[in-house]
């Protein structure tokens, strides 16, 4: 080691008085290692070395030596000469303690660093290395194999989103990084990246107690992750903790269908139960006992993992173990022959990747015993073998595209409200939906019994094993758990189905699908004792999300206020420093303060507007749980317990009007009490009278009871409290009633009031509303050229089409409730502000001087928007022969953004006319140098043809 480096080392040892100071020294040395400026190097050296000369940065070679003593990379040391290699074995006692320093360096890297520090020419070469190579690897980086690197983007719960969790930086101390990851886990226990970093940090310190504690916490969230179980087993086995290893096997083997994990178990079993060589004696009880233990272990493994296509090596090892069995005597030879034939016949019936090799071995084995009996046995098993070999090709087509991430992640459509816009990323949404659909198609294929198995027990074991594999990688997808429970119900294993739903609720604590399904299953099997706790737990989860989102909003508003106060204080300080502190603020300064106040209010309004859809959506989610809770109790226990739940719900600060309506309708239809129902609506009107959607529902209820006097009184009472643009749904609902059941005087009065409220609305629109009934409309499509919103020859066909598009079919491009509301709101705005025209019509009704024509919306409800047919989408993303692969992902994302065709009710254009318009448009397509006739619709237009 050079003299300069030795002096730096001695000075550093003197400065090691606390762990915090050690971390600061490490951070400074890291800065020096990546090549900061000479001034920064001098400051860092002054902090780390109190005895260094003032000109420590003048000597570049000395700096390189000092840096290499701590941070030189192992790859750069390969360029050192033979002298450096000879010094690599120098004792490490003269190096400073690594505790609190760069803790991810291995012993080999430390040895290479020591060797490199003794070779000055090599250090000069190392100084020219790229910064990314010279910087030590941070603790948080996981060393993944190729398959893990392919799926590593799926580890983070918000991977690929704009709302990434906070990441550590290289200047953080070890304790700071640990606190950061612990905080991330506290916020989101399913943050796999944070878990892996914490475990890696504990292992780097060789703290077995901390590592065990972290693994125990980790496996409560990720109980089926084979890679982490294997890492845990390797760690315990490296310390010869055999009791701990066996305890881990008891925890994970039965619930983790991983071939690698079971191979590890068999390897461990053979290690602790070594099969002694044969002594040649007639009987060797110890060896016979060991052999029985090993064969029992293989039978145990094959019972759980033998259906996996990658378990072929376990089958071949088991066959080899039986072949090596010593058998003396006729009955023992016969037993060995029967056992071997039985294992062969089981193996060739499973679609294994090495099934052809096993079949050839079986063929040779049978022919080696007796060629006459071989034909009989081979002919019996040949159909099963041919079926398995054929199914193997289909199995590969279904299973090869399946995504198997390093750790399961939470899908974007089930993330919490705190995720913000991350759950609205269409590209990520589509990608994860395709991955889930691929697994679901594979599971459906397994349920279809492609092997034509006659043994029901074997078929059921194979399907349930497939579902277990699916939950290994899609643990946080409620759909998989639900489908597994439905399959178990279909084969009359109801109790096991309930267990799957319970496990699914633990994995997906906020899943409405699983909680509702569990309550439904409990009701079906007359076991409802724990269903109330299921509803209460789901309510607590949703309410906690609402409170957290509201707290985040208040924190954001407080931060904005603090920033504004800080700006004001800085302005006051500036004026005081300029000598204007006692002088009145001039007009220009007051104007700046006024504008700053306006900007502050705008910023607050933006934050509130951004949070409102999330909070309102969560409140509606809470309302749905309350409603389903009431319905469940009414069916199982009667109306009184349901009323008790309603009493609890209306006292909640997060209750919405839907809960009141559900209770009122329940009283009306189940208790046959219209008076109580009306009182519930009136109670809700006091709180939600400003909600036009609730008013419309109340009107519907009164009209359905034929209580026209109260309905008219309600309409007159509330219509004046709404602005015209907000009152549109109420006007439309009352107009629909008057058009159908009112007299001519009432209709004329209503038309006059509508004309006063909406003076720009065309008369033709109101006439269409008066002349139509539900979805029967002839004036619009036949006389005015307005295409019908719903296609179909009859009302029945239109109803079927509406149910197909707006129903609850599965599909990756089904719109969320929030997006539906956004589309509805935009449509409502279009009713009052958009332009409405038919082909050939002028921009005003009746010619010049008339009011502008508005966009027309039908009274009948449009179906839910869907960009594609759901069934077709599910098929194209899941099957082995993908029919949509020709479309780039960006095109699919754009197509997904397009609204449904049924939402369009304006004028229809011919595609040929649009293409001709595009062809003749003067659109610049090139840069300035190439701009000309070809770029403005000249010769360049030929490329459209």
Swiss-Prot record:
Q: Region annotation Disordered: residue ranges?
A: 1-24, 36-171, 568-590, 801-868
The record ties this protein, via InterPro entries, to:
HAT, Rna14-like, Suf, TPR-like_helical_dom_sf
Query: Entry's SUPFAM superfamilies?
Result: TPR-like
Compartment(s) where it occurs, according to its Swiss-Prot or TrEMBL record = Nucleus; Cytoplasm
- Classify the source by domain of life: Eukaryota
Tell me, what is one Gene Ontology molecular-function annotation carried by this entry? mRNA binding
Extent of Basic and acidic residues compositional bias: 1-13, 801-824
Composition-biased stretches (Acidic residues): 40-91, 579-588
Which Pfam families does this UniProt record tie to the protein? Suf (PF05843)
- Here the segments flagged for biased composition (Polar residues) are 120-136, 150-164
**The HAT repeat ranges on this chain:** 172-204, 206-238, 240-271, 289-324, 335-368, 416-448, 458-490, 602-635, 672-704, 706-740
An example Gene Ontology biological process: mRNA 3'-end processing
One GO cellular component, as annotated: cytoplasm
| Keyword Nucleus in annotation | yes
Q: Which UniProt keywords apply?
A: Cytoplasm, mRNA processing, Nucleus, Repeat
Q: Which PANTHER family would you find in this protein's record?
A: CLEAVAGE STIMULATION FACTOR SUBUNIT 3, RNA CLEAVAGE STIMULATION FACTOR
Function text: Component of the cleavage factor IA (CFIA) complex, which is involved in the endonucleolytic cleavage during polyadenylation-dependent pre-mRNA 3'-end formation.
The protein's name is: mRNA 3'-end-processing protein RNA14
**Species name for this entry?**
Mycosarcoma maydis
Give the lineage.
Eukaryota, Fungi, Dikarya, Basidiomycota, Ustilaginomycotina
